[in-house]
């Protein structure tokens, strides 16, 4: 790990919580998380699998319910199998305390409750691709959790060589960018951090301007370049030269699509995005752009920063 810059400390996971389904999607979760804990100092990790509520299963399945329930019985054997599978896929890390548990209940409610109980500062969850209601649990968890949430699609690959950080110059953007820099400080081989701003071309018909469209586009780009430099020099002083900036003018609706297209075409390994705060109103919306990125993303891990 390289020496820390005095402004932003290297990233550290004090208490991680990893949600597992005990199925195929766990492979990519454990693969990426094993890479991450090999780079980032990690204190404690709590692995949790939530079974559906048995009384609900019984009502749906009737007489066959008891047999199904017996197959999902919460006992030491299930936890032991879970532990064996995790340890077989992850390397041992000195100083990292690991705990395993299996609980019954509503998956979202149980994950949120346990994340609060263990005071998780990072929640990790997988996301299936190509299914109906794509990423609903992951999206809702990212929306309601108070901790940073890492969503790992089942087509993801382990490794971070290029981080994409979409910004809109808001406070949430600052948190996301500082987190990306902090994470980069912990990597043995620093990644390229691309600070991405998607900006919209105004409707020129409502303005009385004495410029051609081409002249206006150049002026708009210059203004955003200056805004980007001012933002970086103010919010992350000393790091400007370590960051790559990219401005993209939005010509069609859908900022999230622009973000995904750029991240895919440019080989992004991790998207780091800001989210809304924790007030009752803000908890209702994670942020439309962030939610849409999560919904359409099937291959790039996304870290939602709170």
Where would I find each of the regions flagged by the language model?
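Gly/Ser-rich helix-loop-strand patches that form or flank binding pockets
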Residues: 1-7, 12, 39, 110-159, ...
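Structural beta-alpha unit
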Residues: 1-11, 35-37, 52, 69, ...
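Small/aliphatic-rich secondary-structure junction motif
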Residues: 2-68, 162-217, 221, 233-241, ...
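Amphipathic coiled-coil/heptad-repeat helices and related helical stalk/stem segments
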Residues: 29, 107-108, 134, 176, ...
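Short, charged helix-to-loop "capping" segments that act as catalytic/coupling loops
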Residues: 34-44, 131-133, 155-157, 182-192, ...
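A structural preference for short, hydrophobic beta-strand core positions in alpha/beta folds
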Residues: 47, 99-102, 151, 195, ...
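Short, surface-exposed alpha-helical segments at coil->helix boundaries
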Residues: 72-87, 221-233
């Amino acid at each position: 790990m390289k020496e820390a810059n005095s402004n932003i400390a290297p990233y550290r996971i004090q208490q991680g919580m990893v949600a597992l389904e005990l199925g195929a999607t766990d492979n990519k979760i454990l693969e990426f998380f094993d890479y991450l804990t090999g780079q980032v100092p990690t204190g404690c990790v709590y692995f949790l699998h939530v079974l559906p509520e048995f009384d609900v299963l019984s009502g749906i399945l009737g007489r066959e319910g008891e047999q199904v329930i017996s197959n999902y019985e919460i006992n030491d054997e299930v936890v032991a199998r879970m532990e064996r599978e995790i340890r077989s896929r992850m390397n041992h890390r000195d100083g990292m305390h690991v705990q395993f548990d299996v609980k019954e209940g509503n998956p979202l409610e149980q994950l949120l409750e346990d994340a609060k109980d263990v005071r998780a500062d990072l929640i990790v969850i997988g996301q299936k691709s190509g299914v109906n209601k794509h990423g609903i649990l992951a999206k809702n968890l990212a929306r309601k959790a108070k901790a940073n949430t890492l969503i790992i699609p089942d087509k993801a690959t382990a490794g971070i060589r290029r981080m994409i950080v979409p910004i809109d110059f808001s406070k949430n953007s600052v948190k996301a960018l500082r987190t990306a820099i902090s994470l980069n400080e912990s990597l043995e081989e620093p990644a390229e951090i691309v600070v991405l701003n998607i900006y919209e071309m105004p409707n020129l018909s409502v303005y009385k301007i004495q410029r051609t469209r081409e002249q206006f586009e150049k002026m708009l780009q210059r203004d955003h370049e200056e805004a980007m430099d001012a933002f970086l020099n103010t919010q992350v002083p000393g790091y400007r030269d370590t960051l790559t900036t990219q401005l993209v003018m939005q010509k069609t609706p859908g900022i999230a699509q622009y973000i995904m297209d750029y991240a895919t075409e440019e080989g992004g390994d991790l998207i780091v995005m800001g989210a809304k705060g924790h007030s009752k109103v803000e908890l209702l919306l994670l942020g439309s752009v962030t939610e849409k990125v999560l919904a359409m993303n099937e291959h790039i891990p996304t870290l939602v920063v709170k």
